[in-house]
């Protein structure tokens, strides 16, 4: 399936969700097509991530003679075509990993040529693991090693958290954001639903890591705890009672239990009659 390889686990599940980032897939066209338009993660900026996918479109000659020049050319072309976008993730695929293309070196060269852009590389070809799970791990660990704490953002609340492992499937991240706003909690970074590249560079500034999908994103939460002392709290937002339990756990951490109970009461009053109909 489109989720069946390690590359897909990195690009389709996590990286490709970001709303302001060019997703450059260094490999044959099929690798890009297979991980495009197969997930429903909308954004509040016109669904940029769902409209576009980029590929170096490797052919046989590039496999034989190397694809680094083609990658460099493709990166410049993408930035030229999307002048408002200054962030990019570059992924290796099976062919480009097998021939040993050095995508990190190419990324450094492009960033030197274009000082206003930032590029993250994910070296996770399909064959590097037995399932998509390997791709989750590679992107999680690569991001915290290379990008976290490379930027600071303004903190506007006394309560801050990272919301990790939620990918805005059918807009759930945006719905949950309304709850955090009502509770007065600032989300430093969404990993990665409706999220931005630069917000993810600020994950070290949060007081709490709330994990919604542990399988895909628990790795970075564990590393944030180990390196920065940020506690990890797991919730399940899929389900009425589960969500209420999650809100209670988060509010207990911040000492705002009354706010949490008020929010839950409002939502119960709104939705319980409709839920009762199904009983």
From Swiss-Prot:
Residue sites binding [8Fe-7S] cluster per the record: 5, 31, 94
Chain sites annotated for binding [7Fe-V-9S-C-homocitryl] cluster: 213
Record keywords, A-Z: ATP-binding, Iron, Iron-sulfur, Metal-binding, Nitrogen fixation, Nucleotide-binding, Oxidoreductase, Vanadium
One Pfam family hit: Oxidored_nitro
Enzyme class: oxidoreductase
Gene Ontology terms describing biological process: nitrogen fixation
Swiss-Prot/TrEMBL cofactor(s): [8Fe-7S] cluster; [7Fe-V-9S-C-homocitryl] cluster
Cofactor comment text: Binds 1 [8Fe-7S] cluster per heterodimer. Binds 1 [7Fe-V-9S-C-homocitryl] cluster per subunit.
Chain segments annotated as coiled-coil in the UniProt record: none
Catalysed reactions listed for this entry: N2 + 8 reduced [2Fe-2S]-[ferredoxin] + 16 ATP + 16 H2O = H2 + 8 oxidized [2Fe-2S]-[ferredoxin] + 2 NH4(+) + 16 ADP + 16 phosphate + 6 H(+)
Keyword Iron: yes
EC nos: 1.18.6.1
Family annotation (Gene3D superfamilies): Nitrogenase MoFe cofactor biosynthesis protein NifE, C-terminal, Nitrogenase molybdenum iron protein domain
InterPro entries with a match to the protein in the record: Nase/OxRdtase_comp1 (IPR000510), Nase_asu (IPR005974), Nase_comp1_asu (IPR010143), Nase_comp1_CS (IPR000318)
Superkingdom classification of source: Bacteria
Molecular function terms from GO: ATP binding; iron-sulfur cluster binding; metal ion binding; nitrogenase activity
Function: This vanadium-iron protein is part of the nitrogenase complex that catalyzes the key enzymatic reactions in nitrogen fixation.
Note: The structure of the 7Fe-V-9S-C-homocitryl cluster is assumed to be analogous to the 7Fe-Mo-9S-C-homocitryl cluster.
PANTHER family: NITROGENASE MOLYBDENUM-IRON PROTEIN ALPHA CHAIN (PTHR43457:SF1)
NCBIfam families in alphabetical order: alt_nitrog_alph
Family label: Belongs to the NifD/NifK/NifE/NifN family.
Subunit structure: Hexamer of two alpha, two beta, and two delta chains.
UniProt protein name: Nitrogenase vanadium-iron protein alpha chain
Organism of this sequence: Azotobacter salinestris
């Amino acid at each position: 399936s489109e989720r069946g390889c390690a590359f897909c686990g990195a690009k389709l599940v996590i990286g490709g969700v970001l709303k302001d980032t060019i997703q450059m897939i260094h490999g044959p066209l099929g690798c890009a097509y297979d991980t495009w338009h197969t997930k429903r993660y909308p954004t509040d900026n016109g669904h940029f991530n769902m409209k576009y996918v980029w590929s170096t479109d490797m052919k046989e000659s590039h496999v034989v003679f190397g694809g680094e020049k083609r990658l460099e050319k493709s990166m410049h072309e993408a930035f030229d075509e999307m002048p408002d976008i200054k962030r990019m993730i570059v992924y290796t695929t099976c062919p480009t990993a097998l021939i040993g293309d050095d995508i990190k070196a190419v990324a450094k060269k492009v960033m030197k040529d274009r000082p206003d852009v930032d590029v993250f590389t994910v070296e996770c070809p399909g064959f590097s693991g037995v399932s998509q799970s390997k791709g989750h791990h590679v992107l999680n660990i690569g991001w915290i090693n290379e990008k976290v704490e490379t930027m600071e953002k303004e903190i506007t609340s006394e309560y801050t958290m990272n919301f990790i492992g939620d990918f805005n499937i059918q807009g759930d991240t945006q719905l949950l954001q309304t709850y955090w706003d009502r509770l007065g909690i600032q989300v430093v970074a969404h990993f990665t639903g409706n999220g931005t590249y630069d917000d993810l560079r600020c994950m070290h500034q949060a007081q709490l890591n709330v994990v919604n999908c542990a399988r895909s994103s628990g790795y970075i939460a564990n590393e944030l705890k180990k390196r920065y002392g940020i506690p990890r709290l797991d919730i399940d937002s899929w389900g009425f009672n589960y969500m209420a339990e999650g809100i209670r756990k988060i509010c207990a951490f911040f000492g705002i239990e009354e706010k949490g109970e008020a929010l839950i009461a409002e939502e119960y009053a709104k939705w319980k009659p409709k839920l009762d109909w199904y009983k």
